[in-house]
């Protein structure tokens, strides 16, 4: 298992223990009341992305043309401008500030 006390969590798409803030892309919560962030962890070919949401189970989305979706999930990820954006039920919830890697 992962050493949670050292900040490690299991990543399904990477198949290893990771520290999400070290390898993930941080998404800022657009709700002005909340300061919690979400993180995106991509697999090697970016065909799958694991979403780490505060307080929720991880969600794995699969690339579909220019976005990532999961059947039966309320979440989707897209690239808008130079940012990743996370939608829940078609409402924009999170946005990255660091830009989209090339």
Task: Place the predicted regions along the sequence by residue.
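Disulfide-braced loops of extracellular cysteine-rich modules
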Residues: 1-5
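Generic short beta-strand
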Residues: 7-8, 49, 83-84
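Extracellular, cysteine-rich, disulfide-stabilized repeat modules with beta-strand cores
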Residues: 8-15
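Mature extracytoplasmic domains of secretory-pathway proteins
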Residues: 20-69
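Short, surface-exposed linear segments at secondary-structure transitions and domain or protein termini
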Residues: 66-73, 101-102
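C-terminal partner/receptor-binding element of secreted or periplasmic proteins
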Residues: 76-102
């Amino acid at each position: 298992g992962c050493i949670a006390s050292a900040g490690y969590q299991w990543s399904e798409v990477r198949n290893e223990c990771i520290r999400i803030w070290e390898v993930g892309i941080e998404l800022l919560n657009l709700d002005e009341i909340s300061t919690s962030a979400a993180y995106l962890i991509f697999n090697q070919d970016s065909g799958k992305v694991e979403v780490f949401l505060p307080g929720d189970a991880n969600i794995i989305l699969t690339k579909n043309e220019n976005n990532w979706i999961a059947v039966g999930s309320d979440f989707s990820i897209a690239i808008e401008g130079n940012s990743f954006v996370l939608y829940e039920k078609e409402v924009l919830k999170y946005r990255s500030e660091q830009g989209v890697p090339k």
